[in-house]
Amino acid sequence: MKKTLLVSLVAAVAASSAVAGARRSPDPVGCYVVALDGETAKSADWQKVADALVAKYSAKLVNYDASSVEGILPELRKLKPRYVCFVTAPERAGRSLVVEAAQTLRKIDDDPYGDAIWGIVTGYNADDAMRMVEGDPIEVESIATSMGGSRTLDGWKHGFASDEGNMGRMWVKLPGSTNTVEIATSPNPAKSLAAAFRGIPVDYWVTSGHATEHDWQIIYNKPKGGCFVHKNGRLVAVTSQNDYALVFSPNPKVYIAAGNCLIGHVDGKDCMATAWMHTGGAVQMLGYTVETFYGFMGWGAKSMFESGRYTAAEAFYLNNQVLLWAIGKLNKDLRDVEIPAKEKLSTRKFIRMMQGRIRTQDELGLTWDRDTFAFYGDPARSVRFPEKRKDIDIKVSGDKITLDFLRDVSFPDKIEVKSTRPVAVLLDKAPARGTAIFAEGGEEPLADSVVTDVFALIPLTGKHPKGEKLAFTIRPGESSAAAK
């Protein structure tokens, strides 16, 4: 089928977005802090963004100085928020804010874990930031991905998938259709992908491959496949012949740049991240602010999000807590290591900096990923998969936690830091100090489990069939992976 068919197919599609009411998450009202950059507060338009969040969640507004984010710690320790949202113009939304925010929010109390679900609201302009704040919940039922194959779109209402390993292939599934159609895209996959974005609204965009703050290569390691770039806040597709096509996809979506270097770094007003927010419809975006080689945060957040258990913001936050758990199992001394926030950091420089402290590739990768992966958007906005995609239903009632397996789920046969993702549970309220997780009927705390004021981690092993139910309680005790 010729690539021109793609244009005719997508031209017939009416714009739509999948919007649904939010399901159970901790209530953000009254436990939300809006942290507004002091310089940004001088703009009336940006002040309106912060005010909208305050009104939405009965939030507390605090101002911070971009030169020292940690300066708001006394206020955070007093308020003990469940959610923290940093509001800033893009000129001050760079890597230093991402790193300092992550490090600051681990210091609200005395355990080594993050103490609030957080995000950064920014954009090419204040209107983009306001769209992050004011929009409806999103129920993710359509997808676009750069990692496609012939079965990628099965189970999705509609979407499209390019293949970063093949210049000539792309798959399209139109709204209302049950069939996936393969499209020939060579020699201009960039134009074909731009046309798909213009014609088919999707809720979820996920990518890998080469990227920087200023471009994304469509076909891995093959410049002839073209790229996406930005110009004056707009996304543009560029072919290898320097032909241009506008990438315009304004419907609200979440973008997870799971395997891309640098595309999550807002290094100024005009960059790839702000272009996705401005003309690409990204009201939430997750991505690396550095080169990525280990991938725990990117692929882990994607996996947790796609489990259906969590919103995108919860997946970002909880995957980071799993990473901190893994660091604690490998080398607790690394919990005190802080990546420099104010200087440009390459992997080589980081390796030299960590000589004598890092012993393994896992320790290096986990420490590198810990504070360098960003979440942009309102952290309390519900962006999640529909109930039918959930693999485990998690219920919390007082000190009791129940896991109901809705599908067959397999975990590694033994606890391993790189492959084990404990089941993460957001708690309704902070449990008493000195408590641990116990399996139903168990007399000893569950090995390697964690309980904090915000969440619990329950490591599981082996296969768990659909229909199985597991029950746990939180009561006095201390596990081998205690928060201390």
Feature-to-residue mapping (PLM):
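Boundary at the C-terminal end of the N-terminal hydrophobic targeting segment
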Residues: S17-A22
